[in-house]
Amino acid sequence: MTRPVVTRFAPSPTGFLHIGGGRTALFNWLYARKHGGTMLLRIEDTDRQRSTQEAIDAILDGLKWLGIDWDGDTVYQFARAARHREVAEQLLAAGKAYRCYATAEELTAMRDKARAEGRAKLYDGSWRDRDPSEAPAGVKPTIRLKAPLTGETVIEDQVQGRVAWQNENLDDLVLLRGDGTPTYMLAVVVDDHDMGVTHVIRGDDHLINAARQKQIYDAMEWELPVMAHIPLIHGPDGSKLSKRHGALGVDAYRAMGYLPAALRNYLVRLGWSHGDQEIFTTQEMIDAFDLPAIGRSAARFDFAKLESLNGHYIRQSDDHSLVTLLEDLLKYIPQGPAIATKFDDSIRAKLTQAMPGLKERAKTLIELLDNAGFIFADRPLALDPKAQAVLTPETRQLIGRLRAALEDVSPWTAATTEAAMRAFAEQAGLKLGAVAQPLRVALTGRTTSPGIFDVLAVLGRDECLSRLADQSA
């Protein structure tokens, strides 16, 4: 009988939720959801000096923002240290592990000698079969696994294929340190086994760990989970991903104005493919996702592609939901608190009214907010340099005449204001563009905006006439 699928995401809380970690979590989540299984969350907080509550909170918050939920309670690895020690003692009692009394100086000498001789195995196994009665006084022993000395350790990986290591090149790895704390290798195996994990989906930088962990599984006579080591994310030029390329926390993408659905869609296509399809609903991702469709080559991060995809999601979003997203964004950007004080029902209504025109022009929520700035700008408007260049003395006189032509328009709509401006332009012998641009500058402080008659309608009669008065001669 096939066991139900259980995946896990197991980040170390030493910083933010990295974009690569977000993709790993997404792949685990998709695979579990596709197979009607569960995805567990384990915080690998055994590095007590580097693990922080702030980082844990950032990871949990990042996952929730991405729309990735997990099943059951969060497991904290450090809290399970007694269980990890118990397994090490079991292996010791079964003769599958041993106490190593090598001093730090001896270990350094062994490593230096091995490197000088070009040997991969750095520990010489000197305490493997040595009588513990020969132990030197005052040395706290580690517990090491008695790894096989001959043959090979093989992982049949769902992404990488068959990967083999010669056992003669693998050390007897440390299970418990001299102070009694378990090592990462032991803790991961024990936790995955006890949590019932059936599939380990993680970055291919963990591939060598898989060989060492399999030796622990074999020693304990536990079933090895299915392994899938996914390619890392590189920069557009193929080099290691840096902050310049996009090696940022998920929280940074939120602050840059990316929609969680867009980032999810982009991440799923980094290393995984499904024909030529680029845009997926969440359900389509779940239905289509599978491990064999993940490539072995490093995926290349492309900001332009992410922006384009984000723009698509913005255009497809409901106007009301975009207003909510904009308001939520304010918590994460420097200028947010000042703008948040202006958000009231009137501003929300104006944003919703303007959104059809605004969202066609924006690739991120930051751009969307910037383009909507005219709605909550304070009078007199701050003019950008291009707008200032438009406002010559002659233009200011024209704005005064435009204001007079608009003063009696009723009702105040995009259609009625457009009719008034067309009539004014015709009467003055001007092209409509010669009228529209001064209006745009006076009403928005910029030379680009949504359709000028939409701007007039959104701002309303009183605000428009006041802004025109501010800029007229």
Curated annotation (Swiss-Prot):
The keyword Isomerase does not apply. ATP binds at residue 243. InterPro entries: aa-tRNA-synth_I_cd-bd, aa-tRNA-synth_I_codon-bd_sub2, aa-tRNA-synth_I_CS, aa_tRNA-synth_I_cd-bd_sf, Glu-tRNA-ligase_bac/mito, Glu/Gln-tRNA-synth, Glu/Gln-tRNA-synth_Ib_cat-dom, GluQ/Sye. One of its GO terms (cellular component) is cytosol. Keywords: Aminoacyl-tRNA synthetase, ATP-binding, Cytoplasm, Ligase, Nucleotide-binding, Protein biosynthesis. It catalyses: tRNA(Glu) + L-glutamate + ATP = L-glutamyl-tRNA(Glu) + AMP + diphosphate. It is found in: Cytoplasm. GO terms for molecular function: ATP binding; glutamate-tRNA ligase activity; tRNA binding; zinc ion binding. PROSITE patterns: AA_TRNA_LIGASE_I. One of its GO terms (biological process) is glutamyl-tRNA aminoacylation. It comes from the Bacteria. Its main location: cytoplasm. Its EC number is 6.1.1.17. A motif ('KMSKS' region) lies at residues 240-244. It holds the Pfam family tRNA-synt_1c. A motif ('HIGH' region) lies at residues 11-21. CDD domains: GluRS_core. NCBIfam families: gltX_bact. Monomer. Belongs to the class-I aminoacyl-tRNA synthetase family. Glutamate--tRNA ligase type 1 subfamily. Catalyzes the attachment of glutamate to tRNA(Glu) in a two-step reaction: glutamate is first activated by ATP to form Glu-AMP and then transferred to the acceptor end of tRNA(Glu). This is Glutamate--tRNA ligase. The gene is gltX.
